[in-house]
Amino acid sequence: MIILYIGNVGYPDTAPSIHVRNRAIFMKSCGHEVHVLCELASDGKRMEEVDEVAYQYMDPYPGRGKVRGAFWNLDQVFGKFYFKQTLKFLDKIKPDIIILYEPNSILYVLKMLNLSKKEGFKLV
Protein backbone atom coordinates (compact mmCIF):
# COMPACT_ATOMS: atom_id res chain seq x y z
CA MET A 1 0.00 0.00 0.00
CA ILE A 2 1.02 3.58 -0.56
CA ILE A 3 0.60 5.62 2.61
CA LEU A 4 0.77 9.41 2.72
CA TYR A 5 1.14 11.41 5.92
CA ILE A 6 0.06 15.05 5.62
CA GLY A 7 0.84 17.53 8.38
CA ASN A 8 3.24 19.95 9.98
CA VAL A 9 5.84 17.28 10.53
CA GLY A 10 8.74 18.56 8.46
CA TYR A 11 10.44 20.59 11.16
CA PRO A 12 13.58 18.83 12.40
CA ASP A 13 13.83 17.71 16.03
CA THR A 14 10.19 18.17 17.00
CA ALA A 15 8.11 15.49 18.68
CA PRO A 16 5.53 15.23 15.85
CA SER A 17 8.20 14.95 13.14
CA ILE A 18 10.13 12.29 15.05
CA HIS A 19 6.91 10.37 15.79
CA VAL A 20 5.83 10.36 12.13
CA ARG A 21 9.31 9.41 10.90
CA ASN A 22 9.46 6.46 13.32
CA ARG A 23 5.96 5.29 12.31
CA ALA A 24 6.89 5.61 8.65
CA ILE A 25 10.04 3.54 9.15
CA PHE A 26 7.93 0.86 10.86
CA MET A 27 5.32 0.86 8.06
CA LYS A 28 8.09 0.59 5.46
CA SER A 29 9.45 -2.45 7.32
CA CYS A 30 5.97 -4.00 6.90
CA GLY A 31 6.23 -3.58 3.13
CA HIS A 32 4.39 -0.30 2.57
CA GLU A 33 5.57 2.69 0.56
CA VAL A 34 5.49 5.80 2.78
CA HIS A 35 5.47 9.47 1.81
CA VAL A 36 5.25 12.56 4.00
CA LEU A 37 3.81 15.84 2.71
CA CYS A 38 4.63 18.73 5.00
CA GLU A 39 5.23 22.45 5.24
CA LEU A 40 8.70 23.79 4.69
CA ALA A 41 10.00 25.47 7.85
CA SER A 42 10.27 29.26 7.54
CA ASP A 43 14.03 28.98 8.15
CA GLY A 44 14.31 26.45 5.31
CA LYS A 45 15.43 23.54 7.50
CA ARG A 46 14.36 20.10 6.37
CA MET A 47 14.06 16.70 7.97
CA GLU A 48 17.06 14.41 7.67
CA GLU A 49 16.35 12.12 4.75
CA VAL A 50 16.11 8.42 5.53
CA ASP A 51 15.73 5.65 2.98
CA GLU A 52 12.38 4.52 4.38
CA VAL A 53 10.57 7.87 4.05
CA ALA A 54 10.07 10.16 1.05
CA TYR A 55 9.54 13.75 2.22
CA GLN A 56 7.72 16.17 -0.06
CA TYR A 57 7.60 19.83 0.92
CA MET A 58 4.76 22.21 0.13
CA ASP A 59 5.52 25.61 -1.30
CA PRO A 60 5.99 28.12 1.53
CA TYR A 61 3.25 30.59 2.35
CA PRO A 62 3.70 33.83 0.39
CA GLY A 63 5.47 36.83 1.88
CA ARG A 64 7.62 37.27 4.93
CA GLY A 65 7.09 38.18 8.54
CA LYS A 66 3.60 39.49 9.26
CA VAL A 67 2.39 38.95 5.69
CA ARG A 68 3.40 35.29 5.78
CA GLY A 69 1.85 35.03 9.25
CA ALA A 70 -1.43 36.48 7.96
CA PHE A 71 -1.58 33.89 5.16
CA TRP A 72 -0.84 31.15 7.68
CA ASN A 73 -3.60 32.39 10.03
CA LEU A 74 -6.16 32.53 7.21
CA ASP A 75 -5.23 29.03 6.17
CA GLN A 76 -5.81 27.79 9.72
CA VAL A 77 -9.47 28.70 9.20
CA PHE A 78 -10.09 28.04 5.51
CA GLY A 79 -7.39 25.53 4.54
CA LYS A 80 -7.45 26.67 0.89
CA PHE A 81 -3.68 27.03 0.40
CA TYR A 82 -3.00 23.73 2.19
CA PHE A 83 -5.62 21.94 0.08
CA LYS A 84 -4.20 23.27 -3.20
CA GLN A 85 -0.72 22.16 -2.15
CA THR A 86 -2.09 18.72 -1.28
CA LEU A 87 -3.74 18.33 -4.68
CA LYS A 88 -0.41 18.97 -6.42
CA PHE A 89 1.10 15.88 -4.79
CA LEU A 90 -1.87 13.50 -4.85
CA ASP A 91 -1.60 12.95 -8.61
CA LYS A 92 2.10 12.11 -8.28
CA ILE A 93 1.82 9.82 -5.28
CA LYS A 94 -1.63 8.23 -5.77
CA PRO A 95 -1.95 7.02 -2.16
CA ASP A 96 -4.19 4.23 -0.91
CA ILE A 97 -4.31 5.74 2.59
CA ILE A 98 -3.87 9.33 3.74
CA ILE A 99 -3.17 10.06 7.39
CA LEU A 100 -3.88 13.65 8.38
CA TYR A 101 -1.54 14.44 11.24
CA GLU A 102 -2.93 17.32 13.32
CA PRO A 103 -4.84 18.96 10.46
CA ASN A 104 -4.94 22.72 10.68
CA SER A 105 -8.47 23.44 9.46
CA ILE A 106 -11.82 21.71 9.77
CA LEU A 107 -12.68 23.00 6.30
CA TYR A 108 -9.53 21.31 4.98
CA VAL A 109 -10.60 18.05 6.62
CA LEU A 110 -14.07 18.31 5.05
CA LYS A 111 -12.54 18.93 1.61
CA MET A 112 -10.30 15.90 2.10
CA LEU A 113 -13.29 13.76 3.14
CA ASN A 114 -15.13 14.71 -0.05
CA LEU A 115 -12.02 14.06 -2.13
CA SER A 116 -11.49 10.65 -0.50
CA LYS A 117 -15.00 9.59 -1.52
CA LYS A 118 -14.41 10.81 -5.07
CA GLU A 119 -10.88 9.38 -5.50
CA GLY A 120 -11.32 6.20 -3.45
CA PHE A 121 -8.51 6.51 -0.89
CA LYS A 122 -8.95 5.89 2.82
CA LEU A 123 -8.65 8.91 5.11
CA VAL A 124 -7.44 8.64 8.69
Label each region the model flagged.
Residues 1-44, 48-53:
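N-terminal subdomain of nucleotide-sugar transferases
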Residues 36, 55-57, 123:
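Conserved beta-strand scaffold positions in the cores of enzyme catalytic domains, especially
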Residues 43-44, 105-110:
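Short, well-ordered alpha-helical microsegments
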Residues 53-84:
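A short, charged, and often flexible helix/loop element on the N-terminal side
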Residues 82-90, 112:
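Generic hydrophobic alpha-helical segments
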Residues 87-107, 121-124:
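Short N-terminal targeting/anchoring amphipathic segment
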Residues 112-124:
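Charged, glycine-enriched surface loops/patches
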